[in-house]
Amino acid sequence: MTLFKGSGVALVTPFKDGKVNFKKLEEILNWHVECGTDAIIVCGTTGEASTMTEEERKETIKFTVDTINKRIPVIAGTGSNNTEAAIKMSKWAESIGVDGVLVITPYYNKTTQKGIFEHFKAINDSINIPIVLYNVPSRTGLNITPKTLLKLCDLNNVVAIKEASGNFSQLVEMKALCRDKIDLYSGNDDQVVPLLSLGGIGVISVAANIYPKEMHDICDLYMNGKTHEALKIQLDMLDVINSLFIETNPIPIKTAMNLKGMDVGALRLPLCDMEENNLEVLKNALENYNKTSREA
């Protein structure tokens, strides 16, 4: 089962006065539907899930499901380095109607490849909705190897992987081993077209928080044979995408949204305001891309 093709936004969580700003969240969700975003990924890394309480995460996920109301798929971040906690959250998410769950590798524990498989198998066996694996070694210190991914493909609910290793040798090996057994999403906004060329079907995107149409268009154009047009957008966006990762995500994207008047509020500690020199780089990149896109 394919959850979605195209651009799924790794959604920020708007805050106000220290709480989730549900009025702003509703506005953002409806805007994404209008802009052509293909899926919503809520309470992931970009959504600052790690600094939210369990109650806040549940309220935010349920609000998103209710607001979207089946217009596009909603995928909830339910991962944890505690397998039982991931199972509990995934079962709850299934019960309130999410279309799928995004489950990160169990960070910090530094388990083995066997442990990775057993972790995902336990989650797989506890639910009956699609699972998107999330491989991001730069954050977790743990990498899903191609051979482990091949084993994970045999789990009945594992349908896709968000691949953010940036290791294209590994991506080629994954595709060679797994072929069409699993859908492949880019976890890196600067590598969407290269990943699509390896048979990927989309991106789970940070940049889509401010550029939903562009990220959708990259995927849509490429998958409809207009590869040069897709590549042009990808290359035109390179500087602004790089600026969105000049500091730890989601610091720059949330800053960029506020600079654009989207009023998504502050970051929660230990995330903090940008360094002044990096903020200037971000401002310049946003301004330069706006000029380029207006002239196009």
From Swiss-Prot:
Major place of residence: cytoplasm
Site note Part of a proton relay during catalysis, residues: 45, 108
Name of the top EC class for this enzyme: lyase
Active-site residues per Swiss-Prot or TrEMBL entry: 134, 162
Disulphide linkage map: none
Keyword Lyase: yes
Residues annotated for pyruvate binding in this entry: 46, 204
Pfam families: DHDPS
Protein localization: Cytoplasm
Keywords per UniProt: Amino-acid biosynthesis, Cytoplasm, Diaminopimelate biosynthesis, Lyase, Lysine biosynthesis, Schiff base
GO molecular function: 4-hydroxy-tetrahydrodipicolinate synthase activity
EC number in record: 4.3.3.7
Functional summary from the UniProt entry: Catalyzes the condensation of (S)-aspartate-beta-semialdehyde [(S)-ASA] and pyruvate to 4-hydroxy-tetrahydrodipicolinate (HTPA).
Family: Belongs to the DapA family.
Name the UniProt record assigns to this protein: 4-hydroxy-tetrahydrodipicolinate synthase
